[in-house]
């Protein structure tokens, strides 16, 4: 009975090590995707109202598209294990138009990060879907900027 328990424990440890090394390997092969995840979470944080006020339709759509892009990247087994709230801090003194412009910059960085040539055919499809969501998010943030500028 003890030898069976030892064997099960050894098999569990081996499975854990294999899973960890596979995750590390994917991350090493696609560091740009990890940068894109960070940029997308950071852009998302800039789109959240600092006073927790109501988001306009364009901002809601942009956040939705960012979430979808993050999900597509994670479907490609490129997951850094971080949640949406794990991002660099947002400057609390930045006004709303500044936050929107910063979100555009971060979305552009994420787009550039994942736009690199992909040799994995499976990942190419997910890459394309993620880029479509990123481009839609960019469009919605531009719309939000136009709304803000029209009210100034």
Question: Residue ranges of each PLM-predicted region?
Answer:
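Bacterial N-terminal signal peptides
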Residues: 8-21
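N-terminal secretory signal peptides that target proteins for export/translocation
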Residues: 1-5
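Long, charged/polar, soluble alpha-helical segments
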Residues: 24-152
């Amino acid at each position: 009975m003890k030898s069976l328990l030892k064997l099960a424990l050894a098999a569990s440890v081996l499975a854990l090590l294999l899973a960890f090394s596979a995750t590390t390997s994917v991350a090493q092969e696609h560091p740009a995707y990890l940068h894109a995840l960070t940029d997308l979470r950071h852009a998302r944080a800039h789109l959240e109202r600092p006073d927790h006020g109501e988001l306009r339709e364009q901002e809601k759509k942009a956040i939705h598209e960012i979430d979808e892009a993050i999900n597509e990247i994670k479907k490609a087994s490129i997951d850094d294990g971080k949640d949406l709230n794990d991002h660099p801090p947002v400057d609390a003194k930045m006004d709303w138009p500044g936050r929107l412009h910063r979100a555009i910059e971060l979305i552009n960085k994420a787009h550039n990060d994942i736009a690199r040539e992909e040799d994995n055919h499976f990942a190419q499809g997910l890459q394309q879907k993620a880029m479509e969501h990123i481009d839609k998010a960019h469009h919605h943030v531009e719309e939000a900027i136009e709304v803000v500028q029209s009210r100034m």
